[in-house]
Each structure stands twice: as structure tokens, then as C-alpha cells.
From Swiss-Prot:
This is Protein Flattop. Residues 169-187 have a biased composition (Basic and acidic residues). It comes from Salmo salar (Atlantic salmon). InterPro entries: Fltp (IPR038797). The gene is cfap126. It is found in: Cytoplasm, Cytoskeleton, Cilium basal body; Cell projection, Cilium; Apical cell membrane; Cytoplasm, Cytoskeleton, Cilium axoneme.
Length: 187
């Protein structure tokens, strides 16, 4: 289909002969001329360097470190507490502090912390639970449960818990105590 068209059919339409200023446009060759000299072969047909050709010394990746060049102790992961719940941040902090690795936390902004009831500022508070209540590293509570039932993990579970309480209270109410609109009529 394209055998009847030349390769430069569109090119000539965009070659401006008048640049709308006083400079003369520079015309380049349509096809470049051949390079001077000849190509020197440095490798055989099998891809090996020919004798007499100097091989380049040094590595192409000078900064690469293999497994054996890595340090014996890798630096610990840093925890970014942004967009985490307080309980999730404490769990991560606890896991890293008790796993034998150090911990680095990022602070997004410096806030003015009001002193807590025990005199500590909000930023100075740490997990002061007795060691018997702390889970051993690696033993995390099952998703949806928080340790020993202290409080739910998310706001959604708090909402669900409050809804179940209201439904159970409604069931406990007698039929006479409920208003006329809320009564369920037996069918």
C-alpha cells in the first residue's frame, strides 16, 4: 500500500523557505554522506575480544554491594506515625523496641503538648503497661480484637459496638414502654 509514497512526502510541506525575518534558512543535506575511514573490529564472531585489544578495567557498577559486602547489622526501619491510630503506633513502636533493633520515628510537626494527668507531656508518654500484659514480640492480637478487650481498634468497631448495645436495650424494653411508631407488630 505504501509503495507509491515517498518517505519525505510530508517533510517538504513543513520546510519553510521564508523565515519571516532577514536570516537565510540553512539547508541541510537530505542524506548524510558516508563516514571517512573504516570500522575496526574488536570482537570475534563469538563475542570474545580479539588479541591485542585492551579490555576496560573496573566494574560497570562500582557502588554495587553483594550479599557478602553488606554490613553485619542493617539499620532498623523507621516508623512514620502519620495517619496511624494511637494504638497502631504504640504497637509498632513496641514491636521494634522489643525486637532487638533500634527505632527511629519521624515527627511531622512540633506541637505544643498539654501536660497529662501524671505530669508528663503528651509527647513523653510511652507504653507503661506491665510486662505481663505486653504481648511477646510476634504475638499480635487477631485482627478486630484488641489484646485483652480493653477497647476496640477502630472507630468503626466502636460504632458497631454502640449499635449492638442500642439494639439489645430495645429488645430488653417491654412493648408498653416503646412508643407507638417503634413497635413491631406481630404478623
Amino acid at each position: 500500500m505504501s509503495s507509491g509514497y515517498s518517505a519525505n512526502q510530508y517533510e517538504n510541506a513543513f520546510n519553510s523557505q521564508k523565515l519571516q525575518n532577514w536570516t537565510v534558512p540553512k539547508h541541510f543535506k537530505e542524506r548524510p554522506s558516508a563516514a571517512q575511514g573504516h570500522t575496526i573490529f574488536i570482537a570475534s564472531d563469538r563475542g570474545h575480544l580479539l588479541p591485542g585489544v585492551k579490555a576496560k578495567r573496573g566494574s560497570a557498577w562500582p557502588d554495587f554491594k553483594g550479599t557478602w559486602e553488606l554490613p553485619a547489622h542493617l539499620p532498623p526501619a523507621s516508623i512514620n506515625p502519620t495517619a496511624r491510630s494511637e494504638e497502631g503506633r504504640q504497637r509498632l513502636t513496641h514491636t521494634y523496641t522489643h525486637s532487638g533493633h533500634g527505632i527511629h520515628t519521624h515527627r511531622a510537626a512540633k506541637t505544643t503538648a498539654a501536660p497529662a494527668a501524671d505530669g508528663q507531656t503528651e509527647g513523653d508518654q510511652t507504653c507503661n503497661a506491665p510486662t505481663s500484659e505486653r504481648p511477646v514480640t510476634g504475638e499480635r492480637p487477631v485482627t478486630g480484637q484488641s489484646g485483652r478487650g480493653e477497647r476496640p481498634l477502630t472507630q468503626a468497631s466502636e460504632r458497631e459496638q454502640s449499635l449492638t448495645l442500642t439494639y439489645s436495650k430495645r429488645r430488653e424494653q417491654s412493648l408498653e414502654e416503646t412508643p407507638q411508631l417503634e413497635r413491631e407488630e406481630p404478623q
